[in-house]
Amino acid sequence: GISALMLSLYNENDKQTQLFRQAGLTLLYNHEWYEHTPLARAEWIKFFGALLDKQAQADSIFEQVKHDYLKYQQLVKDSVKRKKSILTGSSFMGTWYLPTSATYMGRLLIDAGATFYNDKNTTNASLPFTFEKVLLHYKDADVWLGCEAKDKQQLLEKDGRNAWFKAYKTNQTYNFYKRRTTYTNEDGGTIVGGNDFWETGVAHPELVLCDIIKVLYPNLLPEYELFFTEKLD
C-alpha cells in the first residue's frame, strides 16, 4: 500500500490533508511553486533525487541546467545594448496579474533582457491590474508574451481592446501553447489538457529563458527553435 503521499502545500490544515493524516500516511510537501527564481524551482529535482536514491544523478542534472541558464543570461548581458519592453499574460475575470522583479516570471524576463513596468518592484507576488492600468503602462510594449489565446482572432474575441496594444499591431504576440495537450471528445469538441510549460518548464528554466531571448532578440540565438512558445497568427 501507499506509505507516503506528496502534496503541494497550499493549506496544510484543509479537510483532505486531515483525512490523509488520520489514515496514517506520511505527507511530503512539494514547495517548489513557492520559489521566486527559476533556478530555485529547478533545484527541487534534488528533493526527488534524495527520495528515489538518485541524488548524484539529480545533482548532475541540476548543475547542467544551472550552467546553461547562467550561460544564456551572460550572453544577454554581454550582447543587449537596447532592452526591449514586454507585456505578459492576459486579463482574467477583469484582472490582469503582472510580474514584479521578485517573481518567477519577472526574474526570467529580466534575465532575458526585457524591461517592464514593475521591473524595479521587489514584492514577492504578481500584482493585480485593471485593463485600463495595463493599457496605460504597457500599450507600447515591444512584445506581448504568454497570451491566453491560440491566435490573434481569439485574442480579439476575448477583448476587442487587445487590438490597442502595439505588440498586437506589429504581430509580436506569443503564447506558451506549443506543448499544450488537446483532445477531441466523442462529440467532436476540443478539450484542453495539460501544458508542458508548467512541467518541463519548471525543471528546465534554461529552455524558457531561451524562448524569451529568441522572441526578444532572435539574432542572439539564430539556430534555436522555440520550445514552448508559439507566435499568434
For the regions a language model picked out, list residue spans one by one:
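Extracellular/periplasmic juxtamembrane helices and adjacent flexible linkers that interface
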Residues: 207, 216-233
